[in-house]
């Protein structure tokens, strides 16, 4: 693994330290000469602060550094400048309340929405601006407006999950804060501190123990960014649908697109209507445009229709649905396989990707008064930030999601293990993620 100077995730939580028997008193003789501030650990210094917020410049710097690490390195002749701008800031309460009262703001996490513009792509990053859990929560290089109900709900769920993982870290720090502060007093180093984190504090932490593990070194992400609209659905019937973007047809279906992208990665031999699927042609361009050749449209259209038929997809004008285990059925038709459905598990994803196997993920909403929200997509990469400092080990896990929306909203999302429960805009999720790991040829 490569050692990096890592602005991206400035801090995680140091182990709980032994406290003095009497928090009000020092554990050393008051006449003892004060030791250097360097004898305090980073987290002991943080425990003495009365304000944990990072400066906006530090927030922007973290996004810039993450972009350098997470994005492919273009040639110098084509490299564009990354323009960053803070669009909004939301204080999220440690209890998980989306918006805090004035009293609650005294101990809340500021979440920054940072707009990213580079070349012809316009995306965003979500960033925690609190030193207790300063990290990138989501990094999305390209995002269109959230114009469909499905996109809005699924992206909201992923954002909420990333924020939830962040809140847990801050909450844990609060449980050991007094112990850390008392240890600092025991070292007889009590001094006034700025209300804001100084840049030197961040730079010191950057020089300590960060290592990055990145799946791209051994497993490239998908080369295609397909979607559900035209021309992917061009072989479905026109039956009075009103969406012009879909050529007045039913959408191809998220489950169908996820399966199609998995097949494209492994290129199994497949004949549809007596004609072999030309994977090389299909993958020549990242996306297939509406202006593509008739031959290319036929290839992608018949592939999507074939998968839909094998998966027994139910086509409706507003959404096309497949069963949660449809991928198991379709893969079996082309000499491929995957694991049975399991709840989201980081180790399964990590091992699957390292073994050269994609992972299908899905989020399933429960019945509610609005409508059921389900989505399937492909996890095709990961990023791990490993932190080893003063006998304390911590990791932050990111998965790279290819969401099947023509590349829009694909990116790295900070996620934790299964068991997250929350409600967003009337849609309840009892279990955020399920996965089919180890997609591969038999």
Task: Indicate residue ranges for each PLM-predicted region.
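C-terminal motif of bacterial Sec signal peptides marking the signal peptidase cleavage site
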Residues: 16-19
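Soluble non-cytosolic domains of exported or imported proteins
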Residues: 53-57, 245-257, 318-325, 343
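Structural recognition of the beta-strand scaffold that forms the well-ordered cores
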Residues: 113, 126, 253-264, 299, ...
């Amino acid at each position: 693994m490569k050692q990096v100077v890592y602005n991206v995730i400035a801090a995680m939580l140091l182990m709980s330290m032994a406290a003095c028997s009497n928090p009000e008193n020092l554990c050393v003789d008051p006449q003892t000469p004060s030791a250097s501030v360097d004898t305090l650990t980073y987290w002991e210094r943080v425990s003495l602060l009365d304000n944990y917020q990072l400066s906006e410049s530090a927030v922007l710097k973290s996004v810039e550094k993450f972009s350098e690490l997470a994005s492919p390195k273009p040639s110098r002749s084509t490299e564009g400048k990354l323009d960053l701008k803070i669009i909004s800031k939301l204080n999220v309460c440690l209890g998980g309340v989306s918006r805090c009262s004035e009293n609650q703001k005294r101990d809340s996490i500021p979440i920054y929405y940072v707009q990213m513009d580079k070349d012809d792509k316009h995306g965003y990053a979500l960033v925690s601006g609190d030193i207790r859990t300063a990290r990138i929560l989501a990094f999305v290089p390209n995002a269109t407006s959230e114009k469909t109900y499905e996109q809005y709900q699924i992206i909201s769920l992923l954002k909420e999950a990333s924020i939830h993982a962040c809140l847990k870290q801050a909450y844990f720090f609060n449980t050991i804060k007094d112990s850390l502060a008392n240890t600092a007093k025991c070292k007889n180093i009590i001094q006034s501190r700025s209300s804001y984190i100084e840049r030197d504090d961040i730079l010191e932490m950057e020089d300590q123990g960060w290592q990055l593990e990145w799946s791209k070194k051994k497993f490239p992400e998908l080369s295609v960014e397909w979607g559900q609209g035209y021309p992917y659905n061009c072989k479905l019937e026109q039956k009075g649908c009103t969406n012009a973007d879909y050529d007045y047809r039913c959408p191809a279906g998220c489950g169908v697109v996820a399966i199609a992208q998995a097949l494209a990665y492994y290129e199994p031999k497949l004949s549809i209507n007596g004609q072999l699927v030309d994977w090389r042609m299909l993958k020549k361009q990242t996306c297939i445009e509406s202006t593509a050749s008739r031959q290319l449209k036929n290839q992608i259209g018949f592939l999507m229709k074939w998968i839909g038929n094998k998966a027994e997809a139910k086509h409706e004008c507003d959404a096309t649905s497949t069963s949660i285990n449809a991928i198991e059925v379709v893969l079996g038709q082309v000499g491929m396989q995957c694991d049975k459905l399991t709840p989201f598990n980081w180790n399964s994803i990590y091992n699957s990707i390292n073994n050269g196997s994609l992972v299908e993920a899905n989020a399933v909403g429960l019945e509610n008064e609005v409508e059921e929200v389900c989505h399937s997509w492909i996890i095709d990469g990961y990023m791990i930030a490993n932190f080893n400092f003063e006998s304390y080990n911590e990791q932050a896990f990111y998965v790279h999601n290819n969401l099947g929306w023509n590349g829009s909203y694909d990116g790295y999302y900070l996620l934790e293990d299964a068991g997250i429960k929350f409600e967003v805009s009337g849609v309840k999720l009892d279990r955020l993620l399920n996965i089919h790991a180890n997609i591969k040829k038999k």
